[in-house]
Amino acid sequence: LSMDFMHFTLSRIATLDSLAAFFILLMITLLIYGLKLADRVLAEGRKAPSMKLVAWMILDGFAVGMGVSTKWTGFYAMLAMAVCFLFFIGTWFRKQKKNRKPVRYVVTLCIEGLGIYSLLPLGVYLLSFIPQMKAEGARNLWEVMWNGSLYMLNFHSEIVFKHPYESPWYTWPLDLVPLMDAGDFIGEDKVSLIATFGNPLIWWAGIAAFFYLICRVVRKRDR
């Protein structure tokens, strides 16, 4: 992140994206640790829930809630985490059935995960609207959250702001058209510009690494 232009720009113009990126990295890191811990617990033949694993999942659930509450970008990351979690659940279930071992722990883990990763983020997201509720003098927190979420959804889905410096979203991964944030003339011969774009060395290499990992998973994954 310290070498990426986009992170540098977004952190300097005080957007929420840097905070959202932090929580997304945190929740994914905690998920990876939790999956590894669950795999070790399962290999030990445990049949009852592991409190250590549940504690890590709860911590991760709070991180997910903070990410979603900071910016809805965290919600998309949460969906990706759900797919990853269910994929591992399915893999463990098939492995236990194949080895003729009880699947009780896998089922329990699935129920715990779905509950924690659904209720905790929703609770944190709901609580994040308390300042808004106090500012409006309202009493129904759920109504404030619902109306605020609908307002944000409608605003971003209906906004149309055409200008010559716009950057189509499909050009972002390749850095084809930098997003111009601000511009101003300084004197007669100088211009001040603020643009958002990624470091091509990192982004282009990241795209190549992404497709390499996809091929590696398909060809060499543990069957």
Model regions and ranges:
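Aromatic-rich transmembrane-lumenal/periplasmic boundary elements in polytopic membrane proteins
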Residues: 102-114, 121-175
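Hydrophobic, aromatic-rich transmembrane alpha-helices
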Residues: 185-222
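Short acidic/glycine- and proline-prone juxtamembrane loop motifs at membrane-interface regions
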Residues: 12-19, 70-73
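Transmembrane-embedded, aromatic-rich helix segments that form part
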Residues: 21, 59, 73-94
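Membrane-interface transmembrane helices that cradle and orient dolichyl/undecaprenyl
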Residues: 27-56, 86-95
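Membrane-interface helix-loop-helix junctions at transmembrane boundaries of multi-pass membrane enzymes
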Residues: 44-51, 93-112, 208-223
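Transmembrane alpha-helical segments
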Residues: 23-35, 79-86, 123, 206-214
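Transmembrane and membrane-interface helices of multi-pass
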Residues: 1-4
